[in-house]
Amino acid sequence: MAEMADKAKVEEMDWEGIDGVRMTWNLWPRTKVEASKCVIPLAASISPIRRHPLILDLPYAPLDCKTCKALLNAFARVDFAAMNWVCPFCYHRNHFPSHYHSISEINLPGELYPQYTTVEYTLPPDPSRVPPPPVFVFVLDTCMIEEELGYAKSALKQAIGLLPENALVGFVSFGTQAHVHELGFSEMSKVFVFKGNKEVTKDQILDQLGLGSSSRRAPTSGFSKGAQNGFQSSGVDRFLLPASECEYTLDLLLDELQSDQWPVQPGHRPQRCTGVALSVAAGLLGACLPGTGARIVALVGGPCTEGPGTIISKDLSDPVRSHKDLDKDAAPYYKKAVKFYDSIAKQLVAQGHVLDLFASALDQVGVAEMKVAVESTGGLVVLSESFGHSVFKDSFKRMFEDGEHSLGLCFNGTLEINCSKDIKIQGVIGPCSSLEKKGPNVADTVIGEGNTSAWKLCGLDKSTCLTVFFDLSSTGSTAPGALNQQLYLQFITRYQNSEGKSLARVTTLTRQWVDTAVSTENLVQGFDQETAAVVMARLTSLKMETEEGFDATRWLDRTLIRLCSKFGEYRKDDPTSFTLKPYLTLFPQFMFNLRRSQFVQVFNNSPDETAYFRMLLNRENISNAIVMIQPSLTSYSFNSGPQAALLDVASIAADKILLLDAYFSVVVFHGMTISQWRNMGYHHQPEHEAFAQLLQAPQEDSQMLVRERFPVPRLVVCDQHGSQARFLLAKLNPSATYNNANEMSAGSDIIFTDDVSLQVFIEHLQKLAVQS
């Protein structure tokens, strides 16, 4: 358990470096059979456009291999005399073009410097095309009480004020019906109304909006804001206007907008047509700006009860589906709604557009059903209890902010992966969609978005992360690495930034093959236990969603026992002799906390909350994702500065303040004595300045966490034995429970649970790992 306190030191290091890549294994076994014995899959967590000061910017287009299309990189063998280079992936010899004629061993182009394994190319702009501005269509739910709608409208006004002046803005409101507002019609408020109780096709949407083939007007001269065909400009003129031109109109429109006026019968839910509204927004963007970076930003305040995407009946006596209902197939609307949002996802991916979801309600709104559309398009998701809550307000503002805390929103991306012969790609877990590009490096077995070596990333930002799973195709007789000891992987991300520039980020990595049939000693030295824990969490979540009757706890336990049995050091049938190398010592406690986490123990949460947690787990980097699995705990006391503390109930003391970072929530917990002194006002007295500073330190640190994170976490400030202390206690190792309360020290605490403690878990693990 002492290793828990060492974790803070590990977090201080920049594990991802310039490349933004972390792997479960940094040394690879040579055969498929040996890879299967590694227990933890061969996987890489990649942050395709993560910012780093050492990444080289190159103002020209990259060179590609004529055979395999891999791009020129620092691992290519270059013959300067013959002016050619050998591709490390397929060994094909390529000639340099004439504009590379001046290169030499002392005059290398940036992509050939050995330290620049990641470079970013700024692709030359197309002179015939104006760089497209970013596009935002806001979709606002009006089936809310006036107070909630007021909060949402205020947030929208603030967001529009933060947009770049050239950003195009559209607006759709919905309740019982969906309303498309023609912002370009300045004489009066002009609205196109769509019935909310039935599905509308793309053609019906276009015809009703006057954008169909029968009603297309001639193009207006000189207007080409991202429109690919001339006729589309009329739709842009009418429904999508630059923020600078429509800010005043939208302000007036929002001021006049009221809660949905359709009468709601007593004991019934409002008639809310979320599905139709999103269909209409997608159809509008598809008609006006296909293939251009655009986002649908939906603010939803309750469950869809009308038309496609319905998740619950209007009768309030019917509860919204729970995990038990989904398990028993007793959620009558669920599968149909998922199928509908899957069709929206496919449409948006084909158009290159993003769906962002801000769901704010005490009830569920249907995040579980919409997950496929948000995740496939790389959209952002924020779940909160109210549009007046800081989780929504601060997160929504962050989405549009510039500067240091900007999310770095980018559009229209693709990811391609090249790898050495005999390495196969099984698939990707994360915010992307398969482009179904077949090839020799595509595996037969599929994990997540598979059967491809290229993916669409409609929306991505500086923190977007994807997990790529690999397999080996070789058998013992044709083992890779027999001739070449190095393997190579290349990740190519092409995307459009917020200014409309086209960029290509290229990361090329090498790792070493090792012969694990002889010894596993070297292999273990390349094990990244944090990455392995996160990959296991993502894989477990995927299996729980896709495999019927999957027992997550049992599968994780068996995996951990096999890993410890394979790589632990012990005498057969002697648990006391069991030890793990330093590269593995943290992994069992990560698995212990994963078993107890919201990703596995889903029955404490709603399906919406589980979908939300999993979407963020799948898109965040390893450092953030590991905090979701195993929160970090910091202790503050008079005797010392902030110190990393064990994630254990034993860390609670009457004279300490604890700061828990559980990613989705940040908890400041005051010990009993501290809270009593604070309530007596000691911190206001000059002679107790040290106490005032002690109270202030965790508050400042918690605010820093809140400022740096998206979505903004929930901040909980509580006292020992107070009602909200549960937010801390639920995350701590229950080493002291009501069963052994007599062993407690004064001022500490107990947890009322029958869950096993980490110590008991490790004892059982040792016993099972050493069995003959």
UniProtKB/Swiss-Prot annotation:
Tagged with keyword Nucleus: no
InterPro entries xrefs: ADF-H/Gelsolin-like_dom_sf, Gelsolin-like_dom, Gelsolin-like_dom_sf, Sec23, Sec23/24_helical_dom, Sec23/24_helical_dom_sf, Sec23/24_trunk_dom, Sec23_24_beta_S
Zinc finger-like, as annotated region: 65-90
Gene Ontology molecular-function annotations: zinc ion binding
Record GO cellular component, one term: COPII vesicle coat
Gene3D superfamilies: beta-sandwich domain of Sec23/24, Sec23/Sec24 helical domain, Severin, von Willebrand factor, type A domain, Zn-finger domain of Sec23/24
Keywords: Cytoplasmic vesicle, Endoplasmic reticulum, ER-Golgi transport, Membrane, Metal-binding, Protein transport, Transport, Zinc
Residues holding Zn(2+): 65, 68, 87, 90
Subcellular location: Cytoplasmic vesicle, COPII-coated vesicle membrane; Endoplasmic reticulum membrane; Membrane
PANTHER family hit by this protein: PROTEIN TRANSPORT PROTEIN SEC23
Similarity comment text for this entry: Belongs to the SEC23/SEC24 family. SEC23 subfamily.
Name of protein: Protein transport protein SEC23 F
